[in-house]
Amino acid sequence: MSASTLMVLSSLLFATMGVCVKYASEFYSSGEIVFYRGIVGAVTIGFMVWRRGGSLRTPVPAMHFWRSLSGVLALSLWFYAIGGLPLATAMTLNYMSSVWMALFLLGGAIIMGGARIDGRLIATVLAGFAGVALILRPTIDDNQLWHGLVGLISGMLSATAYLQVTALGRIGEPEYRVVFYFSLGGVVAGALTMLAGGANPHTLQGVALLLAVGVLATVAQLLMTRAYATGKTLVNASLQ
């Protein structure tokens, strides 16, 4: 399966997950959703490794740490933004990650001097984001500006995390290992917020939503990680 196809499927699953997160935010805090999402991901990947073989031991723990840190922060902020914004607005702000990636890569190319970035790809990314904005038609009220700023920051952090995913894939780290440590980071961060702020009681609907968020996110992360490892970064970003 091509990287572009993997990215499209991943984006579809992430969008579906966003809907589930919006509904789940009526029952749980963003920290709780991050925690349970991480639990589902870590357990699923651990079971896959146990059944199919492989190893969770990594030669680059520092890279996984920084990828997990930026990714979990981005995820937590996005879930928080989803809870306080119209879903279309929250999704649009998250899709800003592709624009941030283009800016980061362009800035890096300028600083490095010799590196070249295809201007057509950057134009494609910007056009893609404009198309998303036109379709979703995001709106925001004055009392939602804080959540909007949080959503914007989450998109920037997501771009950083995606670039780190690309770097991990380029050095040969398998996607299951990348997703496992990211999920583990979510468990730790979510647990800390729950210790500080407490936890809400479960309902059947709430548990079903948490399970859906975890499964959709895990599969989407695996597909996205493979896409960034094998495809062109900006091409993937334009499809996100």
Question: What is each residue range found by the language model?
Answer:
Residues 80-83, 97-121:
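C-terminal transmembrane-helix exit sites in multi-pass transporters
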Residues 2-10, 49-50, 54-79, 146-154, ...:
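Loop-to-transmembrane-helix transition segments
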Residues 103, 117-137:
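Hydrophobic transmembrane alpha-helices of multi-pass small-molecule transport proteins
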Residues 90-96, 172-185, 221-240:
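Helix-helix packing/entry segments at the starts of transmembrane helices
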Residues 45, 139-198:
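Transmembrane alpha-helical segments that form core, pore/gating elements
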Residues 26-43, 82-100, 144-157, 203-217:
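Structural signature of hydrophobic alpha-helical transmembrane segments
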Residues 3, 28-73, 101-104, 157-161, ...:
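Transmembrane alpha-helices of multi-pass small-molecule transport proteins
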Residues 12-40, 160-185:
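Juxtamembrane helix-loop-helix junctions in multi-pass membrane proteins
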